[in-house]
Regions:
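A composition/biophysics-driven feature that prefers long, compositionally simple stretches
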Residues: 1-120
Length: 120
């Protein structure tokens, strides 16, 4: 069982996701990557002061959204997001301030693993 401190009932998040997916379907999108902190909160309940690093919400046409961000911020996601903990994922600090690695490389691998390498 997931323990969360989300601001709204799950049914409200379900309503928001259904509304977003309807717009995605109309636009012909397979996935949406949401980076604005207020929109992340609107979809997932995520409430963290971590917007200074790469983070966002992956929303596909099925299943729970996935909060993706810095590994050290995952605990905040687990406390404030309504989703199952396996849908709160993080990237390592070796991506932060690196000249060799970029967090978007990690994001690309997660998208590819979900069959979205050629998604729209």
């Amino acid at each position: 069982m997931v323990t969360h401190n989300a601001a709204f009932e799950i049914s409200e998040y379900d309503r928001r996701i259904a509304k977003t997916r309807a717009a995605m379907s109309e636009a012909g999108l397979d996935a949406l990557f949401v980076t604005d902190p207020s929109n992340q909160a609107w979809l997932t309940g995520y409430d963290g002061w971590s917007f200074y690093v790469h983070q966002g919400v992956i929303l596909t046409m099925e299943g729970e959204p996935i909060w993706w961000g810095r590994h050290m911020d995952m605990m905040g996601g687990r406390r404030t997001c309504w989703m199952q903990h396996e849908n709160i994922i993080g990237y390592g600090d070796h991506y932060v301030q690196s000249t060799q690695f970029h967090p978007m490389q990690d994001l690309a691998e997660h998208l590819k693993a979900r069959g979205l390498a050629r998604g729209r």
